[in-house]
């Protein structure tokens, strides 16, 4: 038997695989504006990651159209990067002394889609008693947190050549500068998305659901966040 044309409330549980694209508009390292110099690398400006998370929904089936409220909580992303480079600034061939510059970058960043509370309207196309493809639209209130802690330290030091048969001497740094960019935000916004999928009727009341949804979480101040999700779940109509 298929799902039937009955109406009534329903609940749905899904397991979703999400591809997440996060874009941060941090100040550029070359930004001439005073106080807006940034040490954040491109890695933390343009983040692509993925996660698996559960989603629950409650709704009402009108016999073609459905409306539902859903809730999801995503996995927290965090990472750290450290890099160091040494560049020779000057070398004297007469005595072998040299002056070098050491650049160290330490970055720690995190992003967490804390919650998404959505409301969707879905239309089911009844092909037969078993299969019902569907399309829909979704509006959601999302909460995200993100932070970045980036430090760039530049040190210049002198190395003097020793006498023949002895090791060189590295002297304490004679010039050192340090720049840092720290930012932490907790933002709530309304975003829009689309839904598509297909339902397979197991019993008149129980449906296996395979779906896809795209959601733009809105302009989160200096951050843009978009998700593509593929999900598999079951829907039970009372």
Curated annotation (Swiss-Prot):
Role this protein plays: Implicated in a number of adherence functions. OPA proteins are implicated in pathogenesis and are subject to phase variation.
InterPro entries for the chain: OMP/PagP_b-brl, Porin_opacity
Entry annotated with the keyword Chloroplast: no
Single GO term (MF): porin activity
UniProt family annotation: Belongs to the opacity porin family.
One CC-aspect GO term: cell outer membrane
Protein name in the entry: Opacity protein opA68
Signal peptide as annotated in the record: 1
Chief location category: membrane
Keywords recorded for this protein, A-Z: Cell outer membrane, Membrane, Signal, Transmembrane, Transmembrane beta strand
Domain of life: Bacteria
Lineage summary: Bacteria, Pseudomonadati, Pseudomonadota, Betaproteobacteria, Neisseriales
